[in-house]
Structures are given as C-alpha cells and as structure tokens.
Amino acid sequence: MISICCSRFSCILFLLFLIFSLVLSYIWWSPTKGGTNPEVLPVVLWHGMGDTCCVPFSLGAIMNLIVEQTKGGYVRSLQIGGNVLIDWQSGFFIHPNEQVDYVCKQLLQDEHLAKGYHAIGFSQGGQFLRAVAERCPNPPMRNLITLGGQHQGIFGLPMCPTLTEKPCDYITRLLDNAAYAPEVQKALVQATYWHDPIMENKYRLGSTFLADINNELFINKFYIENLQKLKKFVMVQFLNDTIVQPKESQWFQYYTTGQNKVIQPFTESKVYQDLGLDKMHRQGQLVFLGVEGDHLAISKAWFIQNIVPLLLEK
C-alpha cells in the first residue's frame, strides 16, 4: 500500500510539473538567451534525465546566471523536439544517437556558434555532449564541462542505497538481464549506458551508445581526433552522489572487470588509451573537479567560482 501511495504521489507531482512547464512555455520559455556580448564564446547546455531545457527554476536559472556572469553572452539550452513534452520524454525514450544527430544539425544551423562554443552537460547530458564533440567537430567545441556525467556508464539504481541489499541486487540484476535486448536498447535511454562490469562482452556487444563513443567496439580515430581538439575536458564529480553508481564514472573511472566493488584507477583503464585520454591527460587537457553534495547539488557561489572562469576562456 505504501509503494502504491508513493507511486500515485509521484504521478501527481509529475503531472503538476508538466502542466506548470507547459504554462511556462508560453510565458518565459526560451531555449536561447543573451547574445549582446560578442567578446565571449557562446555556451550550449544539455539537461539531464527528468528535466527540460528551460524551466526557470532549473536550467532557465542557469541560463540567466551565465548571461549575467558573461555580461550578455549567448546561451543556448538544447531542446529536443518542438515542445516541452517531447523534450522531457527525450530523457527517457529517444535514443541518444537520434538525439545527438538532431543536436548536431541544430548547432550547425546556429550562426552564433560558428566560431566555437563552450558546452555544459548535466548528468546524462554530459556524455551526450561528449558524443557531439566526438562526432560533430563543426561548429568547434572549446571547453566541455560535464556535471555528474556517466562517462563509463552506470551499474545500479537511483537511490538504491535506500533499499536493503537483497531487493536492490535483485532489481539490478533484473534490469541487467534485459538491458542489452535490442528492443530495450531502442526504447530506454538509460539502457544505452548501462554498463555491466561482470559481463563486459555482453555490454560491449549489446550497448548501442556508450560502447561506441568509448571506442570499446573498435577504435574510431575520428572520435579520438575530435575529442583531442577540445581545449579542456572538465569532469565534475559529486562526492556524495546517491544517484550515479558508481559515482566515479563521473571522472571516467569504473569497476575493475569481473566485479562491482573495486574501482579501477583511471590511468589503468582500457578506455584511457583507446579513446586517446592518455594524451589529453599528459597535455593537461583533462580537469577533475570534486564537489561535496548529492547529484547536481551545486550552489550558485560554487558555479561562479569554478565554472564561470572556464566560460570566459577564448
């Protein structure tokens, strides 16, 4: 009975969110802001799961903050599809490859971005923007900043620590057994970056997104060359994250193959060389930032101190 009540309550909250968002879409909704200061590079944002491009209390507030701190810089928050509902659904039900292709075309058509731009990805938007950097070098991305991105994927459920060990493990294994089925890969975004460290071959062969952008199927030199064109690749890990499991995936780390307890050092991972991260590391292009707090829990002061200076770079 409790779970049913919680489910109903969640549904009511979601419906209220959609109604509120639809109302806002006719009042304040704008995927672009600023543009009066040509001296700073434009900024592109990609929201995370369960969010949309422009809600005033979410990415809309981030847009306003960036415009303020860059004194009128152009900001584009990516909206997938033509309205708020499609944009929200994209976080769950539109395959990342389709979304990345759509975004690449949109960015190419935006004349504000022709000379380059900085990019900030929130949660899964982080690895989606990395795919843009790898697949679509024009217009050129300068600094890529990922806040809580899952660059090595996930192997756990949101808020799973609130469950006891047995049901948590059972649900996780149930998802894993179905995650790589073609119909699930096609239908559920999160399945495309579900990374089973115990059955690596199953992951590599079944993943239709993450295994590709991490060069785990074959070495795509085009991806390496494009990623290395970044001035900086900044990865922010939330040190008390209860959503992303393992949280170290935010720093491109993951479990050592064959188990799901011990984290392999970044420099010892296969992707470190296969994606050309070793060269970027040696040249100082990789930046690792840690922030105390749960998933995407950052303050305005922290953002201004740590992220804004990166957006002011040429």
Curated annotation (Swiss-Prot):
Active site (catalytic residues): S123 (nucleophile), D241, H295
Matching SUPFAM superfamilies: alpha/beta-Hydrolases (SSF53474)
Primary location class: other
Entry keyword annotation includes Disulfide bond: yes
Expression across tissues: Ubiquitously expressed.
Sites carrying sugar chains: N240
Signal peptide per UniProt: 1-25
GO biological process: determination of adult lifespan; endocytosis; nervous system development; neuron fate specification; positive regulation of synaptic vesicle endocytosis; regulation of axon guidance
Disulfide links within the chain: C53-C54, C104-C136, C160-C168
Domain of life: Eukaryota
A cellular component term, taken from the record's GO annotations: lysosome
EC category: hydrolase
Catalytic activity: S-hexadecanoyl-L-cysteinyl-[protein] + H2O = L-cysteinyl-[protein] + hexadecanoate + H(+)
Keyword line: Disulfide bond, Glycoprotein, Hydrolase, Lysosome, Signal
Cell location: Lysosome
Listed GO MF terms: long-chain fatty acyl-CoA hydrolase activity; palmitoyl-(protein) hydrolase activity; serine hydrolase activity
Keyword hit for Hydrolase: yes
Any Pfam family matching the protein: Palm_thioest
InterPro entries assigned to the protein according to its UniProt record, in alphabetical order: AB_hydrolase_fold, Palm_thioest
Enzyme Commission number(s) of this protein: 3.1.2.22
Homology family: Belongs to the palmitoyl-protein thioesterase family.
Note from the entry: Flies deficient in Ppt1 are viable and fertile, but accumulate abnormal autofluorescent storage material in the adult central nervous system and have a shorter life span.
Stated role: Cleaves thioester-linked long fatty acyl groups such as palmitate from modified cysteine residues in proteins or peptides.
Protein's name in the database: Palmitoyl-protein thioesterase 1
Native species: Drosophila melanogaster (Fruit fly)
Lineage: Eukaryota, Metazoa, Ecdysozoa, Arthropoda, Hexapoda
Encoding gene, per UniProt annotation: Ppt1
